[in-house]
Curated annotation (Swiss-Prot):
Cofactor binding: number and manner: Probably bound by a single Cys residue from each subunit; which protein provides the fourth ligand is unknown.
Family: Belongs to the bacterial microcompartments protein family.
GO molecular function: 4 iron, 4 sulfur cluster binding; metal ion binding
Name listed for the protein in its UniProt record: Bacterial microcompartment shell protein PduT
Disruption phenotype: No visible effect on BMC morphology. Slight growth impairment on 1,2-propanediol and vitamin B12.
Record's subunit section: Homotrimerizes to form a pseudohexamer; in wild-type the central triangular pore is probably blocked by the [4Fe-4S] center. Interacts with PduS.
Induction: BMC production is induced by growth on 1,2-PD vitamin B12 medium.
Length: 184
């Protein structure tokens, strides 16, 4: 698994493809995601060692101009973050849930990483801007106090860039909502 990830989110699909090529040529990194996201944006996610990720993201951000939505370099990513992006992390029993919604994928992934590093919660999912108007959201589960802490940490993280849409903690979710949130 990669020690670090880098994310570049752009308002142009063509520019995203161009920069993806430039970033991959600039450093020894792996392409994890290269995808269109709503509404007409483009997302690049790279993995590799921290120095290479920093170089690749610098290459991308320096050439993105006004098409840059957000970027992120995240070293020592928590082991639950990538599985939460590509699917779901399982939760054994119904618990409190917390949801944090952001305006960018990079802000949400950074918030999710900080939340699970600072709280005893399970990061259930990170839904990345596909079919939801370019927004991103994360879902955590655990004891109420831990979920409250995780949501606070994540909200503060997203709020640092002004990219927090909304946050919510549901102490005792209804069974139907629980299934929808944690089972997909």
């Amino acid at each position: 698994m990669s020690q670090a990830i880098g994310i570049l989110e752009l308002t142009s699909i063509a520019k995203g493809m161009e920069l993806g090529d430039a970033m991959l040529k600039s450093a020894n990194v792996d392409l994890l995601v290269s995808k269109t996201i709503c509404p007409g944006k483009f997302l690049l996610m790279l993995g590799g060692d921290i120095g290479a990720i920093q170089q690749a993201i610098e290459t991308g951000t320096s050439q993105a101009g006004e098409m840059l939505v957000d970027s992120l370099v995240l070293a020592n990513i928590h082991p639950s973050v990538l599985p939460a992006i590509s699917g779901l992390n399982s939760v054994d029993k119904r618990q409190a849930v917390g949801i944090v919604e952001t305006w960018s994928v990079a802000a949400c992934i950074s918030a999710a990483d900080r939340a699970v590093k600072g709280s005893n919660v399970t990061l259930v999912r990170v839904h990345m801007a596909f079919g939801i108007g370019g927004k991103c959201y994360m879902v955590v589960a655990g004891d109420v106090s831990d979920v409250n802490n995780a949501v606070t940490v994540a909200s503060e993280s997203a709020g640092e860039k002004g990219l927090l849409v909304y946050r919510s903690v549901i102490p005792r979710p209804h069974e139907a909502m629980w299934r929808q949130m944690v089972e997909g």
